[in-house]
Structure formats: C-alpha cells, structure tokens
From Swiss-Prot:
Protein name (Swiss-Prot/TrEMBL): Uncharacterized protein 399
Topology relative to the membrane: Multi-pass membrane protein
Domain of life: Viruses
Role, per record: Putative amino acid transporter.
Organism of origin: Sulfolobus islandicus rod-shaped virus 1 (SIRV-1)
Amino acid sequence: MELERKSSGIIKSFNVLDIFSINLLYMGILSGISYPLFVSSLMKNVNLLFAIVIGAVFEIPLLLMYYKLTTKFPLNGGDYAYIRTAFSSKFYTIFGISLWLTYVLSQPILGDLVLLNFNIQNQFEQFLIVESLFPLVLLIIASKRIYAKIVDILAIFQIIIAIFIAFKSFNYQYQTFTISNTLLSALLFDLSAFIFINAISYIAGEIKNIKKSSMIGYFVSYGVVAILSILDSYSNLNILFALMPIWFFSYMPIANKIQSRLIQTMSFDKVLPEKFSKINPNVLLLIFSTETIANVLENLLGFNISFGLDGLLFIFWNFIIVAFAYLKLMNDKKLFSIVLTSLAIQIFLFFYLGYQNPIFYKFVIAGNIEYTILRIMILPIIGAIVYLLRKSKINVIPK
C-alpha cells in the first residue's frame, strides 16, 4: 500500500488478510520447500518430518523477537527502523545501505535457482528471464489496489493448491535417516522458507490493529507454512518442483515492497535524497536500476555467490545486528540470548556439517569465494561512502 504523509501520520491501509498474505508469500509453501526437497532427495537418509520441525523450531525465537519489535515500535522500515532507534546515525546509515543492497543482490541468485530447476543454465537466458520480471513486479507494487489483490490471491492460491496436492498424493512413509543429513535438510528449509519472516515489520506503520494483525501475520502464517510444508513434503515431488516459480514470483513483490519502504524511510532520515520520500517513479526507477546492475554482475559477468552464503549474509544483516538493537530497546536478555544461540547453532552446523557433505556443498555452499569476500567488504564500504557524502558534502544527516 502506498505510504502517505498526513498531519496525523501514516495512513493505516493494511488489513489482517494483507498482513497474513504478505508474510506467507515471503516464506512460500509449495516453492519455498521445493529446493530443500530437491537437495534432500539427493543427499538421501533425510527424515523430512524431523527436518521441517527442527527448521521451524530454530526460527521461533526470531519470530517472537520480531513480533515484540513490531508491536512495540510500529514503524515503517523494519530492521532499519529498529537500528535507527537504537544506534547512531553513522551506524544506521551504513546498516541501511548494506541491508538494502543485500535485498538487491539476492534476487538474481534466487531467480537462478528457479531457472536451474528447468535446466536453464545459459547465463544470457537467465539474465533475460530474470530481467523481464523486474518491470512487471514494479508495476504491481506501484498500485496499492493491484498489490493488495495480487498478494491476497497468490496466498490463497498457494494454500488451496498445497492442500489439494496433499489430499491427492499424500503418502507418508517412515524414512531411515542420519542425524547429520536431517540437520542439513533443516537448514535448507530455514534458508528457503522459515527465515523469511520479517516482511510485515517493514510496513508496520501502515497496519490496522497492529497487535491482532501482527499475531496473525507472524504466528498463524508461520504455522500454516510449517504444517502444509510437512504434508506436501510427502506428496508428489514432481508437482512441487514444477510449481517452484510461484514462490519466486510471490517473493519478488514482497522483496520489492520491502525495498521501497526501506528507501523511503532512509529518505525521510536524509540518508537518501528527498525525492525518494514518496512511492513514485523515482523510487521504482532506483529499484529497477540497482536490480539490473545486480543482474548484470551476477548473470552476465559471473560475479555471484552461492545460495547458502547469500542466506548467511541475509541472516547477518537482518537478524544478528537487529538482535543487538532488540536488546538495547527492550532489555530482554533472555530472548536475545536464545536468538543468538539459535543462529550460532545454525551457522556452526552449516559449515561443520555442510563442508563434509558433498551434495550439500555442491548445491548450497560452492561458489565464487573471491566475490563472496568482496561482497562482504563492499556493502558497508558503500554505506560509509553514502554517509560521508550526505554528511560532509551535503551536511544533512544528524550527528
């Protein structure tokens, strides 16, 4: 929904169904589990029931943390808004730019996963297909009426299809398994579905009845995704793989909506120029331009990183840093410790078990190490440059 500044503040335009749909689509059901199921089938010796349950349990502390932050600070901008409230202008500027670019750089990577599922490996074809989706998605987020209808329809559609698939082809069979492979599968479900829980925090200032909507948006959508993921994991896998593009197309409007609110909020804070303070062609053109640059770098020039390492960077910029903001804002040491412990366990298992498993390494970790290091370094450097330009030359960012 379009953000408008009025004398009374932000217009509350998101209802309960919108919030439920947005978070559900961000996680995905059919497609969010397709890639984990594909890799798990190659690893073998995976108990899918245990993997999904473990994966879902891993992220419950994050879910609770975001629910508390969203209801306590119903501000647009999500993670950036919490960091801005807790820390200095220098830090929140660097963080905001780095977070935004993390979203920009992730979209071609996720698009490539979908295309590889259809054996489209030509770099130029990948570039063209991913690029063709950008303007379509931006047109969707430009209209609040169209956006609301599409996210609600896509969410309901995914639920209906997921139930139908489970009803027609559910076939539970006990699976012999190893603990290590099942844990790796759990991490895949996290990286593909269960860590994508914080979309509604970026539009919190536009939510009607914030507590009720957040409860349903966070916990009910999470429960629906977890339950249907279990049911569909024991159903017709070929159908699930064929439906994987649904998730990418569902994810893109949500991720671009997040970018628009992030850009807009940074513009309000003078981190970015004021011309981006409204959702208008300027914002849409900025999103399109940066995503096109990312698409060129990753699909034409080959400067890409692996799906798994991209997910870990997402965890760092979205969750680990925000956990410290949560501690400062809420003084809740218990939940803070649980969140960091859960994330630390996942990161440890990712590297310790992942490097030992050739299938997991090939499909999740292997990638351009040099570019990965460069990407880790360059995002905060760009953020620091933006801070210096806006503060020293334009002198608009407060100290």
